[in-house]
């Protein structure tokens, strides 16, 4: 994730259009750097939200476009990504910043709050509703719960209490 904006900027600087997986940037400064550089170079830079192009989402979009659901006036999206079997496969201790050997992804979730993949659930819904293709959102509601499982994972891996898990 930390490398997405760096690689995208390098491509733009070298005259290439960019399709960058989420998250394309880790902060607003990086977002504006990508926007400004793409405009300066007159190149495309888009978030390649892979969940918009999976078979289920594409089939649902096709059905929506063919009126199978009638007029869609409300939609709800979600994204569940159980990584339990993968936590140990993420590289550990990058640049000495992960002394507990949690792996970069679990460490990120421990330190940051928020929906990491908001567009995974929202992107397909926006497509089905023709958002920015003739319609716009008037209201968006997002909900959150306390972290339970992440805290348990860190405690199991470190053998110590974890009172600072944020996501």
Name the predicted role of every residue range.
Residues 44, 51-167:
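Predominantly a Rossmann-like dinucleotide-binding segment in NAD(P)-dependent oxidoreductases
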Residues 16, 43-44:
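Short glycine/serine/threonine/alanine-rich loop segments
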Residues 1-37:
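Beta-loop-alpha module in the N-terminal Rossmann-like domain of NAD(P)-dependent dehydrogenases
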Residues 18, 40, 104-105:
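General secondary-structure edge motif
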């Amino acid at each position: 994730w930390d490398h997405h904006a760096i690689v995208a900027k390098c491509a733009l600087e070298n005259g290439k259009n960019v399709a960058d997986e989420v998250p394309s940037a880790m902060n607003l400064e990086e977002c504006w750097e990508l926007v400004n550089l793409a405009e300066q170079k007159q190149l495309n830079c888009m978030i390649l939200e892979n969940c918009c192009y999976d078979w289920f989402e594409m089939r649902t979009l096709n059905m929506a476009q063919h009126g199978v659901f009638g007029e869609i006036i409300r939609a709800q999206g979600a994204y569940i990504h159980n990584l339990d079997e993968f936590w140990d496969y993420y590289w550990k201790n990058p640049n000495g910043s992960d002394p507990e050997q949690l792996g970069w992804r679990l460490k990120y979730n421990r330190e940051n709050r928020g929906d990491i993949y908001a567009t995974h659930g929202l992107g397909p819904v926006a497509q089905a509703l023709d958002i920015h293709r003739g319609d716009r959102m008037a209201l968006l509601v997002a909900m959150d719960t306390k972290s339970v499982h992440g805290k348990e994972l860190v405690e199991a891996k470190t053998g110590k209490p974890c009172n600072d898990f944020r996501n």
